[in-house]
């Protein structure tokens, strides 16, 4: 992604910051909170002390983590300053940083665990982000990615979901937010995203031991990447 495209994406997320949580409700059939709670469970399995929440947005995962484990030191990073303004208001004792996931501003082996909820598909160079995650994770660290997945149109449920993404999401999201372009872009980002097998393979190639949990007819999925050294 060139500088121009990155700026365009940043502006887009700044524009929809106030309505971003609504977008997630629409895209996930209202199940995104339940899915985030599963991410938190998976992170807490490794008993972390320091957690990085990439593409933190309005800080939903960071808040859930802090609620479950108040002792955690949580850092949220996002390229959208408007999103982070909301996150900071909602979680006073978290650290939120404007930054680029492709060039993380942290020392090697800084975190016990990393989360990415609904942000991985928006990264321009996903391999580079995975390498950065591996760099800043401590030994035996864990990366958990929650992401919406493209419909499998060979299945009836996939055809319904495809129709939903192409028509209902841009219309309803645009109607509520007044920004039809942003919601059309976000629907397209799901439709054009990698398959679960492709994501699993990419994570393995970048040094993670990977497991995958499909969610709700594979509308979404959780990818768990563990460093085995």
UniProtKB/Swiss-Prot annotation:
<dbReference type="InterPro" id="IPR023576">
    <property type="entry name" value="UbiE/COQ5_MeTrFase_CS"/>
</dbReference>
<dbReference type="GO" id="GO:0008168">
    <property type="term" value="F:methyltransferase activity"/>
</dbReference>
<comment type="similarity">
    <text>Belongs to the class I-like SAM-binding methyltransferase superfamily. MenG/UbiE family.</text>
</comment>
<keyword id="KW-0474">Menaquinone biosynthesis</keyword>
<feature type="binding site">
    <location>
        <begin position="100"/>
        <end position="101"/>
    </location>
    <ligand>
        <name>S-adenosyl-L-methionine</name>
    </ligand>
</feature>
<protein>
    <recommendedName>
        <fullName>Demethylmenaquinone methyltransferase</fullName>
        <ecNumber>2.1.1.163</ecNumber>
    </recommendedName>
</protein>
<dbReference type="GO" id="GO:0032259">
    <property type="term" value="P:methylation"/>
</dbReference>
<dbReference type="InterPro" id="IPR029063">
    <property type="entry name" value="SAM-dependent_MTases_sf"/>
</dbReference>
<keyword id="KW-0489">Methyltransferase</keyword>
<feature type="binding site">
    <location>
        <position position="58"/>
    </location>
    <ligand>
        <name>S-adenosyl-L-methionine</name>
    </ligand>
</feature>
<dbReference type="GO" id="GO:0009234">
    <property type="term" value="P:menaquinone biosynthetic process"/>
</dbReference>
<comment type="function">
    <text>Methyltransferase required for the conversion of demethylmenaquinol (DMKH2) to menaquinol (MKH2).</text>
</comment>
<dbReference type="Pfam" id="PF01209">
    <property type="entry name" value="Ubie_methyltran"/>
</dbReference>
<feature type="binding site">
    <location>
        <position position="78"/>
    </location>
    <ligand>
        <name>S-adenosyl-L-methionine</name>
    </ligand>
</feature>
<comment type="pathway">
    <text>Quinol/quinone metabolism; menaquinone biosynthesis; menaquinol from 1,4-dihydroxy-2-naphthoate: step 2/2.</text>
</comment>
<keyword id="KW-0808">Transferase</keyword>
<dbReference type="GO" id="GO:0043770">
    <property type="term" value="F:demethylmenaquinone methyltransferase activity"/>
</dbReference>
<dbReference type="InterPro" id="IPR004033">
    <property type="entry name" value="UbiE/COQ5_MeTrFase"/>
</dbReference>
<keyword id="KW-0949">S-adenosyl-L-methionine</keyword>
């Amino acid at each position: 992604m060139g500088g121009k495209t990155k700026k365009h994406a940043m502006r887009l997320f700044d524009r929809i910051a106030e309505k971003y949580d609504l977008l997630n409700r629409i895209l996930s059939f209202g199940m995104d909170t339940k899915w985030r709670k599963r991410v938190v469970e998976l992170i807490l399995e490794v008993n972390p002390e320091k957690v990085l929440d990439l593409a933190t947005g309005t800080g939903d995962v960071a808040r859930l983590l802090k609620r479950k484990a108040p002792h955690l030191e949580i850092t949220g990073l996002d390229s959208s300053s408007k999103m982070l303004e909301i996150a900071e208001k909602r979680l006073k004792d978290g650290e939120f940083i404007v930054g680029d996931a492709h060039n993380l501003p942290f020392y090697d082996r800084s975190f016990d665990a990393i989360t990415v909820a609904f942000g991985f598909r928006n990264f321009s160079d996903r391999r580079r982000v995975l390498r950065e995650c591996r760099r800043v994770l401590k030994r035996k660290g864990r990366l958990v990615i929650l992401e919406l997945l493209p419909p499998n149109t060979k299945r009836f449920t996939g055809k319904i979901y495809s129709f939903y993404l192409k028509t209902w999401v841009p219309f309803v999201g645009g109607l509520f937010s007044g920004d039809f372009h942003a919601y059309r872009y976000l629907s397209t980002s799901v439709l054009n995203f990698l398959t679960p097998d492709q994501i699993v393979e990419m994570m393995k190639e970048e040094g993670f031991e990977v497991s995958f949990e499909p969610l709700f007819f594979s509308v979404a999925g959780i990818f768990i990447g563990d460093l085995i050294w």
